[in-house]
UniProtKB/Swiss-Prot annotation:
The gene is nuoH. Belongs to the complex I subunit 1 family. One of its GO terms (biological process) is aerobic respiration. It is found in: Cell inner membrane. PANTHER family: NADH DEHYDROGENASE SUBUNIT 1 (PTHR11432), NADH-UBIQUINONE OXIDOREDUCTASE CHAIN 1 (PTHR11432:SF3). Keywords: Cell inner membrane, Cell membrane, Membrane, NAD, Quinone, Translocase, Transmembrane, Transmembrane helix, Ubiquinone. It is an enzyme of class 7 (translocase). This is NADH-quinone oxidoreductase subunit H. The chain crosses the membrane at residues 15-35, 86-106, 119-139, 159-179, 190-210, 251-271, 277-297, 316-336. It catalyses: a quinone + NADH + 5 H(+)(in) = a quinol + NAD(+) + 4 H(+)(out). Its main location: membrane.
């Protein structure tokens, strides 16, 4: 037994095996959650429209996700004439891989992260910023004006709302004094940041809707204008990778909102019935509740026009988040609450 322990923890191969198992422990449940998020979304939208939704494949339609996956696997990947084949295939892979590796620093419990690094918040911000490249490459490589227009919209939209997201993160970091996501959650042991910083939480979540190209900010793939945007020429598994990446990014925005504002794995109150529930269960429940809000918004809020989207990002969210950041810094300084940076 000690020999196995020495092999796993004292050799490079053993550490590689442990890291791979940790990654699988995150990715396999994430893929299942993404698959069933599509079914749950269709159920929610059906309920909003007074319909039943998927109810044929399996009991209550619960196997619909596997039917959709089988359909995608059996379809043919068609590459348009004039498209750059290498970049055309690279774009969905890049989008999917970036959506997956972002989860490396997300702690679902105290210390439960594949990579518990001290710059976790900065890492997530960097990965979310890189996501736009997959969309731009897809739009350019498809050799389609609809795809290219969608890619241009995506670039402008993501850059616009990343600024507000950055200011929100800086405000949180002023309160915590650390870029480590584990420290951010533990700093909310007594009061979740959503209470003193409610406007910033709202800005962060709405900016997350725009960052993931979800309704009401889905002008990147506006069906009534540019068909499916940057994905218009994609089919089969290449399209499925974009789809999986989009839903994984939605889960990431919900996870970031949970970690930054809703106390991560911490219960609402540190009392006996609530702290019996394991931390990962609280984390998953909060993420699923925020995912429901994503679906609810899609079923109830109409799509913004492009000019309305830009105006909201640059003329409302940006100045408000900057003012709130300065206000937070002033309050922390005057009250003597600025944390000591290690």
């Amino acid at each position: 037994m000690s020999g196995m322990h020495d092999f796993l923890f004292n050799t490079n191969l053993g550490l590689l095996i442990i890291t791979a198992l940790q990654a699988l422990a995150i990715l396999v449940p994430l893929m299942l959650m993404v698959a069933y998020a599509t079914v749950f979304e269709r159920k929610v939208l059906a309920a909003i429209g007074l319909r039943k939704g998927p109810n044929v494949v399996g009991p209550w339609g619960m196997l619909q996700a596997f039917a959709d996956a089988g359909k995608m696997l059996l379809k043919e990947t068609i590459i348009p004439d004039g498209a750059n084949k290498v970049l055309f295939i690279l774009a969905p892979l890049l989008t999917f891989i970036l959506a997956m590796i972002a989860w490396a620093v997300v702690p679902v419990n105290d210390g439960w992260a594949v990579a518990n690094i001290n710059v976790g918040v900065l890492y997530l911000f960097a990965i979310s910023s890189l996501g736009v490249y997959g969309v731009i490459i897809a739009g350019w490589a498809s050799n389609s004006k609809y795809a290219f227009l969608g890619a241009l919209r995506a670039a402008a939209q993501m850059v616009s709302y990343e600024v507000s997201i950055g200011f929100v993160m800086v405000a949180i970091l002023l309160c915590v004094g650390s870029l480590n996501l584990n420290d951010v959650v533990l700093a909310q042991k007594h009061v979740w940041f959503v209470l003193p910083m409610l406007p910033m939480a709202v800005i962060f979540f709405i900016s997350g809707l725009a960052e993931t190209n979800r309704s009401p900010f889905d002008i990147v793939e506006g069906e009534s204008e540019i068909v499916a945007g940057h994905m218009v020429e994609y089919s089969a598994m290449a399209y499925a990778l974009f789809f999986l990446g989009e839903y994984a990014n939605m889960f990431m925005i919900c996870a970031m909102t949970t970690l930054l504002f809703l106390g991560g794995w911490l219960p609402p109150f540190d009392i006996v019935p609530l702290n019996w529930v394991p931390g990962p269960i609280w984390f998953v429940l909060k993420v699923c509740a925020l995912m429901f809000v994503f679906f609810w918004v899609r079923g109830t809020v109409p799509r913004y026009r492009y000019d309305q989207l830009m105006r909201l990002g640059w003329k409302v969210f940006l100045p408000f988040s900057l003012v709130w950041l300065l206000l937070t810094a002033c309050v922390l300084e005057l009250a003597g609450w600025l944390p000591t940076v290690n």
